[in-house]
C-alpha cells in the first residue's frame, strides 16, 4: 500500500493526518524563529483583558503567510490535497491565519470549526514543537463522520496531537477538537491555512498582498461584558 493511500485512509477514518518532517530546510527554521519573535513583540503590546482567560488569540501572519506557504507548496503537497479533497489546489481560496495559545488555566470545550454540511480543509504548519506541556490540540478521531450532539461527543476517545517543527497537521473543519491548557508558561504558536472552495474563476490566495503581522480580536471583547462571558465560558463550557 502506498504512503498516499495510507494517508487518505487515515484521513477518511480519523478526520486528520499528521505528515511528519514535511518541511525541512534552514530557511524555514529561520522564518519560524523570526515569526515567533515578531508575534511575541505584538503580544507584549496588547492589553490582555479580552482573551486573557481563554488564552487563545488569532494571528494574521502577514508577510510570513506567503513565505511559509512557498516552503509548503510542493508537488507532493498538491497531490496530497488533491487526494483528500478530490480537487486541485487551484479550486480553493486559501486563507492564512494562526493561533497563539497562552491559556494557562483551562482547556477549551470541544467544538468544530464549521457546520457539519459546510466543511473545509485546515492545514496547520507546525512552526515550533508542540508537546504535552504547551497546549497541544486535542482531537476526537472519527467524529467528522456524522452529525453528533455535544453529549455524545464528550464520551468519545480523544488524542492529543504532539508534533515537531516542520510537521503538517491536515484536518477537516467538522472534526471535533479543542485547545488544551498550556502549562509551559510560554505562548505557543500554530499557523493555519484554510482551504475553502473558491468563489471566483480562479482560487484566490488571500495572503499574496498581506504585509503586516497582526494579532486579531479574540472571541471575547476587552470590555466588562466580554470578561463576564469569558469567565462563564471557561468555567461552565459544558453548558455553553
Indicate where each model-derived feature is located.
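Non-heme Fe(II)/2-oxoglutarate
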Residues: 175, 180-240
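Non-heme Fe(II)-dependent double-stranded beta-helix
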Residues: 1-13, 20-110
